Amino acid sequence: ELGLKLAKEKNADLVLATDPDADRLGVYVKDTKSGEYIPLTGNMSGSLLCDYVLSQKQAAGKIPADGEVVKSIVTTNLVDAVAKHYGCKLVEVLTGFKYIGQQILKEETTGKGTYMFGMEESYGCLIGTYARDKDAISATAALCEAAAYYKEKGMTLWDAMVAMYEKYGSVSYTHLRAHETSAHLV
């Protein structure tokens, strides 16, 4: 609440917060049309970062033919479309960032595949191979860089998110609790 209050007072473009061990990043982005701050889910912020990071790597000619984007099986399919757009193979792993870390190690030890980006829906992503766990510090830096990049183009991060949906298609999310819905699923 305090962060949003300060953001409104300062007319900030975004609000960022990490958890105490700085491995998850929470994001609010400003919608300039309504003036409201919109919370991004982990799927949204991760997909937005993936698209931005890969677009910058592509512009620099740094996406190898064996580039891979890694996600957990519960992560949005939006990132599948992002990976495909940039010519990267999508690798799905079990839930838990340790499996993304294991995929990085596998790529390094076998020489097959080059890690480009990894994410899971629970607000975690990893931009490089310097770690084997999610990292909100590098995600914060990259998201701020993305915000500046889009601002130069006259866009907010929310505008960039909307543009992603227009480019790749929108995705909806529903969390089901088995004990509440099992009768309806039969």
Which ranges hold each PLM region?
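Phosphate-binding chemistry for phosphorylated carbohydrates and sugar-nucleotides
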Residues: 1-167
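Conserved small/polar residues in nucleotide/adenosyl-binding loops
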Residues: 174-181
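A glycine-rich beta-turn/hairpin centered on an aromatic-Pro dipeptide
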Residues: 182, 186
